[in-house]
């Protein structure tokens, strides 16, 4: 029912400021999750189980991080048929993010530009929200660093967040690829990444001993990487036996949106323009890591055919975000059906 109504809903939302519409959507999803309305209105999505990172996913189509940064709408989102939900990015301390306006729609390109800057309520509130959710499916918790933490001390923020979210996560995503936190992408460099992953894996083992369970770690990387950088990241993932990698985050490239309204706004570009670049990174990663490291493919999925292409490039699972904003819950069911 809601799928047929979504074009009308979207038309109203797209008349609003992009971030205001985002917050309204979250409020609606939160209310729908509390009342059970989301499940009643959402399309029925068939099961298509996958086992990845030692976890069994109801289906291979997940929600990417960024939509629900504080984990406040997990139940409403889960009712829409996703095989897994990822929330965050969360940082140790609450922070407001970058000044508004900081989110821009580019409908002619099926794209969004954002420079949100990890705005979130902090990891303590995040954990409370996660604990309050009734959802018991696969839940990824995405962690980052505070904007005012020097890049040389970034590992401290990641380790602090990992310690706090570990007991409540099905897997934890380490986000080092947002373009909206100054110098964050430096952590993708060979030396910086090696040190960070070593520290995280050491912490993971100690937490596994403490809690009696090993929670997989996934690294989220950028699409703006050359072959040498991808090989270096792949080697580091293999060396530290990281359980997964998410490819990719938003792009800094503006080639596909040059001359469009908002096309020159600063921030990360998501949606259809990142599809090919994301798939290229996935293919190169798969060639480097073989079948050892599962890849979660994200970037520009707007149809079931797009989801199949992402899997054909080498992904084990896929995630939606911008396509979900433009197409609504029907996209979830379409992608699951295409991947059965």
From Swiss-Prot:
Its membrane topology: Peripheral membrane protein
Disulfide links within the chain: none
Cofactor note: Binds 1 FMN per subunit.
Cofactor field: FMN
EC number(s) from the headed UniProt entry: 1.3.5.2
SUPFAM superfamilies, A to Z: FMN-linked oxidoreductases (SSF51395)
One GO-annotated biological process of the protein: 'de novo' UMP biosynthetic process
Signal sequence interval, chain numbering: none
Pfam families reported in the protein's UniProt record: DHO_dh (PF01180)
Residues the record marks as active site: 178 (nucleophile)
Catalyzed reaction equations: (S)-dihydroorotate + a quinone = orotate + a quinol
Record carries keyword Cell division: no
Pathway: Pyrimidine metabolism; UMP biosynthesis via de novo pathway; orotate from (S)-dihydroorotate (quinone route): step 1/1
GO molecular function terms listed in the Swiss-Prot or TrEMBL record: dihydroorotate dehydrogenase (quinone) activity
Chain residues that bind FMN: 65-69, 89, 142, 175, 220, 248, 271, 300, 321-322
HAMAP family per the UniProt record, alphabetical: DHO_dh_type2
Subunit structure: Monomer.
Name of the protein: Dihydroorotate dehydrogenase (quinone)
Protein species of origin: Paraburkholderia xenovorans (strain LB400)
Species lineage: Bacteria, Pseudomonadati, Pseudomonadota, Betaproteobacteria, Burkholderiales
Gene name as annotated: pyrD
